[in-house]
């Protein structure tokens, strides 16, 4: 691929990232992305054989952004010897991303619209989950738990359940349902309750 082709391909992804941020997932048509990039309607097909492949490239940017934010915040937000505090930071970054980057967040987890093997999307998204698994494992070890909890679940399963809980909080908070149900305007207590539910109450 020539330098010009590489530049145009990146431009199409850049436009998609900008578009989903401003107008949401529903705005990401090939035609609209091409129009805003200043190319013909058929030009994106030269670099992305399907609409899904272009959406996957856009979603990859989202995972890269979220991973960078989480890594930086976890490193700065809590001592390594306190993985529970780091999990709290991780959860806040995740929920903040879902709130401030709603369109991108929705795209990232719409696997019916994405091709996981396309353009390294799987390789970009999985490290974030591995970070969560590592933090969960260390938090359980730090609290004196064995490699298995009372339910027989491994850290990877506990992390999966916690992720599902965080995702549910993010979605319901974004829709306004949790604010209505709880009467609260701070997601922090919900995050702490989720951590306690999956890891047990904090002991220190």
Segments and roles (model prediction):
Residues 71-104, 129, 149-152, 158-162:
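Hydrophobic alpha-helical connector segments
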Residues 28-35, 44:
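Append "Primarily bacterial transcriptional regulators
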Residues 116-144, 156-160, 185-196:
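Amphipathic alpha-helical packing segments from all-alpha helical-bundle domains
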Residues 6-14, 21, 26-27, 47-71, ...:
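An amphipathic alpha-helix adjacent to DNA-recognition modules
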Residues 38-48:
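Short hydrophobic/aromatic patch on the recognition helix
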Residues 138, 163-181, 196-204:
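Amphipathic C-terminal alpha-helical segment
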Residues 99-116, 171-179:
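Amphipathic alpha-helical segments used for helix-helix packing
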Residues 1-7, 203-204:
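N-terminal intrinsically disordered/low-complexity leader segments
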